[in-house]
Amino acid sequence: MARLSSLLYFSITVLIFLHGSTAQQFPNECQLDQLNALEPSHVLKAEAGRIEVWDHHAPQLRCSGVSFVRYIIESQGLYLPSFLNTANVSFVAKGQGLMGRVVPGCAETFQDSSVFQPGSGSPFGEGQGQGQQGQGQGQGQGQGKGQQGQGKGQQGQSQGQQGQGQGFRDMHQKVEHIRSGDTIATHPGVAQWFYNNGNQPLVIVAVMDLASHQNQLDRNPSQFYLAGKNPQGQSWLHGRGQQPQNNILNGFSPEVLAQAFKIDVRTAQQLQNQQDNRGNIVRVQGPFGVIRPPLKSQRPQETEANGLEETICSARCTDNLDDPSNADVYKPQLGYISILNSYDLPILRVLRLSALRGSIRQNAMVLPQWKSKSNAVLYVTDGEAQIQVVNDNGDRVFDGQVSQGQLLSIPQGFSVVKRATSDQFRWIEFKTNANAQINTLAGRTSVMRGLPLEVIANGYQISLEEARRVKFNTIETTLTHSSGPASYGRPRKADA
């Protein structure tokens, strides 16, 4: 009994110590008296594009517990497969392309229709034909049971072993078409790659939730590459000297890789990319023949889940937010707002993240509001807007203009108002809650509408008639007209 009591006392002491350490790791990190529109602080150049990184040590990003990155992939550029230590949500800001994910433990569901003969060159036939068969195979196997999927995986392994002496068909996990407006949710540890098959740059922005319960490391983004090599390294991240960032296969000895993959040592050395200085975005020479579904102009409407087919291997991870006909708030003369949460994309319930897409016309205003359950990171994709943000002390901590490519972090509870100053202002907003709640200060569903007139009149020392106008004059819920440029001065601080 005494031993059990000692063990219990020790466990409680450790928990208290760890809790205290976590709480004191970043003391007062959200006591912000000024916010800034942020630009990328580091650029990692590659053969067919670049990766632009925001400084996650910036106070407002530390408060939100996130990091932010922008991938710019040139035509025929391939972003090599990598995985992250935490949940992330990406948004396709420009262009189109292909995306592939490899979910651990899941079998291949796309199978090629053409047979590859060793020494015959490319194993791929015409893209359209193989795509239709790949889609059929994906749907058929994706709804199969676990044992059937395991059987397919074993069959693929058997085909791979036999491929040294006879023909075989390539098999891999799901490949999707992506386009502007697509929002992509990804689990930690899921390897992901992108390919630009269009004629213009493919621009993808992503937020990583460093404070996620799924991140068991520190509050630093850790990207693990399966292929390629970054000659510039991550000195900006870890404070180390300038040294390349190699892929994870580089750390193993060639002999171990040769035994694991059943290949010769020379090929194993090639997997380590030691002499490869192309970076993490490489240019594909010739056709890019992967199995893909046929491209459709519009995505089919999702059917109601039946509780059987939705597994970690087949879970939908993308949704498009650029279609006004599917908007949650739409006014032809003002603009629209589309919300993506776990009710629309169930995978977000596990990731505890959500997104909002906004597009408003000049002089349209998003009514003052705050998020009661999440931090938010706003990225401008097009145009310009005037934004004011107010903290818990009643100080205006941001009062200025944001433009395309800039980032603004808005902590939980901070109130914000946006007004478009260009012909069109468009943004994507990432939130650290699967079902973030918005509370408005003015409008039909606002906090003012919920207060009695007597409370408003006495609280602000105004007449009942003035209180009535404050409460009822704004009939909109989210978007309204702005009368024109307001007075925007320097951030206002409380009197000393």
Curated annotation (Swiss-Prot):
Residue numbers of Phosphoserine PTMs: 338
GO biological processes: seed maturation
Top-level taxonomic group: Eukaryota
Positions of disulphide bridges: 30-63, 106-313
Phosphotyrosine sites (modified residues): 336
Residue ranges with Gly residues bias: 122-154
Database matches in SMART domains: Cupin_1 (SM00835)
Residues in Cupin type-1 domain copies: 35-269, 319-468
Transmembrane segments: none
PROSITE patterns named in the record: 11S_SEED_STORAGE
Leader sequence residues: 1-23
Gene Ontology MF: a single term: nutrient reservoir activity
Pfam annotation, one family: Cupin_1
Disordered: annotated segments: 114-170
Residues modified to Phosphothreonine: 109, 432
SUPFAM superfamilies xrefs: RmlC-like cupins
Record's keyword terms, sorted: Disulfide bond, Phosphoprotein, Seed storage protein, Signal, Storage protein
Family as reported in the entry's similarity comment: Belongs to the 11S seed storage protein (globulins) family.
Function: This is a seed storage protein.
Quaternary data: Hexamer; each subunit is composed of an acidic and a basic chain derived from a single precursor and linked by a disulfide bond.
Protein name (record): Cruciferin BnC2
UniProt source species: Brassica napus (Rape)
Gene name of this polypeptide: BnC2
